[in-house]
Amino acid sequence: TPLHHLLLSEKLDTLVMTSANFSEEPICIDNDEALERLSDLADYFLLHNRDIYLRSDDSVVMEMSNTIRPIRRSRGYAPRPIFLKKSGPSILAVGGELKNVVALSKGEKVFLSQHIGDLENLEAYEFFQMTIDHIQRIFEIEPELIVHDLHPEYLSTKWAKDQSLPLFGVQHHHAHLASCMAENNLDEPVIGIIMDGTGYGTDGTIWGGEFLVGDASGFERMAHFEPMPLPGGEAAIKSPWRIGLSYLYQVFGDNLPAIPALENHDIQPIVQMLEARINSPL
């Protein structure tokens, strides 16, 4: 744009570009919203009289072996479809809790939405619902089925269960396997090594680190990391030292060795949680 041309012509040492939003919140799309929400973040605002109709965050790509690989498929890509080998029913897939994207299929085409983000606040959840309404309207597709993550506490899963359509739950790490298969145009069974974090398992425990054998329609869990208590649940994921302490507790019990890296953490309440198995899901 002309604005980019002016900025680059200044020959500044560094230019940092970022979206107009706080972390985990949708980007602002009008002047009043930006001035209200970002007044403590930015010193100056360059405003425009052309309103933005629909949020679409930056796409993120990586160059690998002289090929551009999308890491986050959003502005400039969405809602261009990806193509399936076989035609199927119209399906709405509502994604997971983090880095959410929704998809709507018709025939051999799957229309992916722009990046929505983490569904951890009201603004993001409202954007999630608005995006679903938008893609259904512009493509004039009425889904016959909703596909959701198995995790019962994900907001996307709860939204799906509130609708009056048939549901199909997909295990989180199987979804990763199927996604990689689709990206590489594969049909035959594959070995999937999924080193992902939280994935609600078919056995009701939290999976993480899976060796799966299967295809897009099903899988067998051949090997995995041993389930470990996560003291504090989601808090353990955000504070990995809790997971380290959980491993130490499984080995040493109450006779924990002195670990310099844990000296600045209050470990006793966490040990008590592990002992009593309080708020420490597997």
Language-model region placement:
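Acidic, glycine-enriched active-site microenvironments
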Residues: T1-L282
